[in-house]
UniProtKB/Swiss-Prot annotation:
InterPro entries: NA-bd_OB-fold (IPR012340), Ribosomal_uS12 (IPR006032), Ribosomal_uS12_bac (IPR005679). Keywords: Methylation, Ribonucleoprotein, Ribosomal protein, RNA-binding, rRNA-binding, tRNA-binding. It comes from Legionella pneumophila subsp. pneumophila (strain Philadelphia 1 / ATCC 33152 / DSM 7513). GO terms for biological process: translation. With S4 and S5 plays an important role in translational accuracy. Interacts with and stabilizes bases of the 16S rRNA that are involved in tRNA selection in the A site and with the mRNA backbone. Located at the interface of the 30S and 50S subunits, it traverses the body of the 30S subunit contacting proteins on the other side and probably holding the rRNA structure together. The combined cluster of proteins S8, S12 and S17 appears to hold together the shoulder and platform of the 30S subunit. This is Small ribosomal subunit protein uS12.
């Protein structure tokens, strides 16, 4: 343990926490334009074709963003909203696109967990 004299000479320094989503610059979401929409494969042991988009943000950053849900309408030059949140089995993907905002449509025929996929409440058929 340090003596009081040592602490007077050289005080304790707080460890700065590094952000997991630096491109957001402390904002909850950011707007951007898709520069490329493509599919990629996850790390072992998983197997799929994951839908991702390369997005140029309004602050100049270019990031890779995951497109969640079944089916999407994104193409090059689509304007999207991205939020933080990584995809564990896709290296380098630290952001998610927000479904149901700007040019991104919500997921069709979704009944549960709709708020996460930008889907409106279905009309009751009686």
């Amino acid at each position: 343990m340090a003596t009081i004299n040592q602490l007077v000479r050289k005080p304790r320094v707080d460890v700065k926490k590094k952000s997991n989503v630096p491109a957001l610059e402390s904002c909850p979401q950011r707007r951007g334009v898709c520069t490329r929409v493509y599919t990629t494969t996850p790390k072992k042991p998983n197997s799929a074709m994951r839908k991702v988009a390369r997005v140029r943000l309004t602050n100049g950053f270019e990031v890779t963003s995951y497109i969640g849900g079944e089916g999407h309408n994104l193409q090059e030059h689509s304007v999207v909203l991205i939020r933080g949140g990584r995809v564990k089995d896709l290296p380098g993907v630290r952001y998610h696109t927000v479904r149901g905002s700007l040019d991104t449509s919500g997921v069709n025929d979704r009944k549960q967990g709709r708020s996460k996929y930008g889907t409106k409440k279905p009309k009751d058929k009686k």
